[in-house]
Amino acid sequence: MLELKNVCLSYGKLEVLKNISLRLARGERIALMGPSGCGKTSLLRVSAGLQKPYSGSVINSAERTAMVFQEPRLLPWLSAEDNVKLTIPAGAKTSSPPVNWLERLGIAEAAKKRPDELSGGMQQRVALARALAYEADLLLLDEPFKALDAGTKENVIKTISGSTDAAIILVTHDAGEAAALGCRVIELDTFGL
């Protein structure tokens, strides 16, 4: 589903990914762990096609890819429900309407509220609801649980695990999150795997 071969990426003179090779099968779940600044987020961005490596190749054969960023990227003039609706392709027969995704993630009361009326944790759950409603076959999750308390995090992880058979790449600093989501852990150090 996703294959990176000898991927290199730099920001100016700072090389953040050096000869990274990685293969992710359909339905497989991996967690990228390592120190801050080692390239975990950059690897997700390259995998999503948001950044082009200066060398190497990226083959993403997923029909639909969804990415949840560290900081929720919600449209501020839309309600939570409308932010989720945006990802549902026209004419798609979805398994669940947007408000159901919000309910499953414990924020049904936020459906009609704009992002500026929500806490950081609630905004993050709206972003997760949006990704799940898209019914992607590849989910790229960049520290999606960092703004959540322990109980909420546990519920959200259970919801994700029970709601999708998508391949997942999770960026996290928490081995417990990786284990709860059923991820194989890949350690990155400076510049590589």
Residues of each region from the PLM?
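Hydrophobic anchor residue at the start of the ABC signature
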Residues: 128
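Conserved H-loop
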Residues: 166-171
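Conserved ABC ATPase "signature" region
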Residues: 95-110
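Conserved ABC ATPase signature
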Residues: 114-118, 122
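Helix-to-loop junction immediately C-terminal to a conserved catalytic motif
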Residues: 48
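The feature captures the beta-strand-to-loop junction immediately N-terminal to the Walker
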Residues: 33-35
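A short, proline-enriched helix->beta-strand linker immediately N-terminal to the Walker B motif
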Residues: 133-137
